[in-house]
């Protein structure tokens, strides 16, 4: 039987809608906690030697979600001491969500719709799920995903906060959790 990692060893998984800052926060948080950082989307691109948008276009969303599911579950169940950033839609898959909640500390980076919408021009070209969508459709997707993101270990509001401030807050909360819950 596989040993369950202690609270200090558990991977930390960052979830939230695309473009909320999971990668930026994750990279800095990993450095602060002396852990490796894994961006699942970047790992998929490395493994498949193509952009996510090309995988969507050539293989379809269903094939991409299967790749994403297998890779994410492997990271959650077979590694420790990592900070892992998930793509915005990954956590919508039941199997991924279950693996994350059972084996990791799941942190939801929450950003309001109004502030997310301000980032839209920067995001749209690299997000296949947003291609050819109207703003109203994007808002529907944003709203639809919120209840699933609420299933987490804890949540941090990111509105009006710089990445460094979010990282410092998370480091403090995580270390406090380690003290309270021990090994």
UniProtKB/Swiss-Prot annotation:
Gene, per the UniProt record: aroK
According to the UniProt entry, its GO molecular function terms are: ATP binding; magnesium ion binding; shikimate kinase activity
Q: Which domain of life is it from?
A: Bacteria
| Catalyzed chemical reaction(s) | shikimate + ATP = 3-phosphoshikimate + ADP + H(+)
Of which family is this protein a member? Belongs to the shikimate kinase family.
Q: Does the keyword Ion transport apply?
A: no
Pfam families given for it? SKI
Q: Which cofactor does it need?
A: Mg(2+)
List localization entries: Cytoplasm
What pathway annotation does it carry?
Metabolic intermediate biosynthesis; chorismate biosynthesis; chorismate from D-erythrose 4-phosphate and phosphoenolpyruvate: step 5/7
Query: What are the UniProt keywords, alphabetically?
Result: Amino-acid biosynthesis, Aromatic amino acid biosynthesis, ATP-binding, Cytoplasm, Kinase, Magnesium, Metal-binding, Nucleotide-binding, Transferase
Subunit field text = Monomer.
Against InterPro entries, the record matches this protein to: P-loop_NTPase, Shikimate/glucono_kinase, Shikimate_kinase/TSH1
Quote the cofactor binding remark: Binds 1 Mg(2+) ion per subunit.
Protein name listed in UniProt: Shikimate kinase
Q: Which residues are involved in binding Mg(2+)?
A: 23
Q: What does this protein do?
A: Catalyzes the specific phosphorylation of the 3-hydroxyl group of shikimic acid using ATP as a cosubstrate.
Top-level EC class? transferase
One CC-aspect GO term: cytosol
